[in-house]
């Protein structure tokens, strides 16, 4: 491989390690298929495969064969990989902050429309998704329930153009879109408690057609993403 190839693999390796550090992929999670992961990362399958092999070699991932096989996360954030996370954040931090701020405004706008346009069917669906989130186990199950609830809010806006913009932005911001980063085991309980509280407030505002409240709550809620990234960045710089 050329030096450029190796440099790109280095960058993708750092990105995948950071994905584990910020809880995009939680311990025990299976990563997307190689082809899908390469598309999310914006690189070729050869580069993605080489980066995955590095993570397997470092013990962060393990390969399982068979119909239910794939690449699985083995542990949360090994202290030996702090430098990789620090490098990624140093390179990407301005763009991440910019994207996160844009995300708060996009989700605020979608929540305002949902509060204006929701139907009785939307109300029933939102309340069911909220209950599903509350009942889900901590970790990956609740991360997935969070994603499904936010998709229901987007659908309740009944605006295809803005919905497409929001979903496209999510894909640019995280490689697990439409799911969101879920932090580490130390920060997760407080984050999930806050998310549950704000979900309840947001769904109530949408159901009650409180447009301004829905927008304000959604913007504050989506700030969680940047807060999780900043916490991981600070840990990487101080460990």
Language model segments and positions:
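A ubiquitous short alpha-helical element
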Residues: 1, 90-97, 111-115, 134-137, ...
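Short linear motifs at protein or domain termini
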Residues: 1-105, 236-239
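A generic short alpha-helical patch detector that favors 3-5-residue windows
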Residues: 4, 8, 77, 98-102, ...
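A short secondary-structure junction motif
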Residues: 19, 23, 80, 172-180, ...
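Conserved amphipathic alpha-helical segments that form helical-bundle/coiled-coil interaction surfaces
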Residues: 103-183, 198-199, 216-225
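C-terminal effector-binding regulatory domain of bacterial HTH transcription factors
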Residues: 211-239
């Amino acid at each position: 491989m050329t030096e450029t190839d190796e440099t790109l693999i280095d960058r993708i390796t750092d990105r995948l390690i950071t994905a584990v550090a910020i809880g995009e992929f939680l311990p025990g999670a299976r990563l997307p298929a190689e082809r899908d992961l390469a598309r999310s990362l914006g690189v070729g399958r050869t580069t993605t495969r080489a980066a995955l092999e590095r993570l397997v070699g470092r013990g962060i991932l393990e390969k399982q064969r068979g119909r239910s096989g794939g690449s699985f996360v083995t542990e949360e954030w090994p202290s030996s990989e702090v430098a990789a996370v620090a490098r990624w954040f140093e390179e990407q931090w301005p763009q991440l902050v910019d994207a996160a701020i844009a995300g708060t405004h996009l989700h605020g706008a979608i929540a305002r429309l949902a509060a204006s346009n929701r139907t009785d069917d939307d109300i029933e669906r939102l309340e069911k998704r909220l209950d599903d989130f509350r009942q889900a186990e901590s970790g990956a199950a609740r991360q997935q329930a969070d994603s499904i609830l936010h998709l229901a809010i987007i659908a309740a806006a009944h605006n295809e153009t803005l919905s497409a913009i929001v979903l496209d932005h999510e894909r640019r911001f995280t490689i697990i879109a439409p799911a969101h980063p879920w932090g580490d085991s130390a920060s997760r309980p407080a984050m999930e408690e806050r998310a549950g509280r704000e979900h309840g407030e947001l769904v109530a505002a949408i159901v009650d057609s409180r447009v301004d409240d829905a927008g304000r709550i959604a913007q504050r809620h989506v700030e969680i993403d940047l807060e999780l990234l900043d916490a991981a960045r600070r840990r990487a710089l101080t460990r």
